């Protein structure tokens, strides 16, 4: 899983459509749709909070380095957040909140700056 490129790969209209299909029925959304929605949301996070202080991982779909501040240049970043696709999309759309996901163990965060509270919900519906 490599960090997202600096250029968008998913056209925003297609990404929003994938997110809407997922929102309508998360359990019935095809895997390819979930993948597109996750990647679109990661690209959107990168676009709104560029930087290299924090790495957000949503395996197996993607990862992005974002948020301004001290950056790392080698190895594992000091600030990492990892979660599954359902948790990521729930957070992005406002269907769950950061504190609840962290307390519930569906988000794994390590590092002093490993938080997304200032950036969520990213794409509320």
Report each predicted region and the residues it spans.
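Feature captures hydrophobic
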Residues: 1-125
